[in-house]
């Protein structure tokens, strides 16, 4: 049985009177591609933000590789949680910052591609490498740790070769076609050496051929790097083609989970996506 990588336990996220995520539980195991879909477009990115430290959940907890990285139990008893500076202490709230979560092995991309627009393809990936190295931008700039810098440059080039962007390494990131910009963003996430890769609408803005190529690319990098992949996506063909398991939420509440075949035949999912004719 594969080890559990991500576990979301009874997470609720509320903004004022709006409940974006309602008591959601889900998990992803080692080596899986798990998708989260929502016909109403609400709640998917919110749960991503709870997992990656952008939001503190209103209630519930997020566990990554056995460690609690986010938790809020306002109505519960003080619990012994294990996360960074909270290690071994009794507390109701745990919230690791996004940079600490990245260093633990979670990387994400965004629906709207976020690249360093004035930097080259090569430098976009190299900058991401610094997040997991002992050197920083200052030491790299003044070559205070030249051996580590050289190793990072070699690794950056190798990663660009793997994702098919080595020939464009000296071009500005924004000069790339949209599909290649998405590959670059994923390459930058891979540069942090994640265990869990979270993809937020990776096929957004792509044409059908680019979407087909992206689907194969996701499977290839998952296998090559031994990743667990968690994605949210509107392109149902992509989701059904590559996912091992799928969770479906409707207005922030989970209505179904299962294999692609099970989800396609689930009456609650069919109703949520297609509606019910009124008599």
Which role does the model predict for each range below?
Residues 2-279:
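Glycine-rich phosphate-binding loops of nucleotide-dependent enzymes
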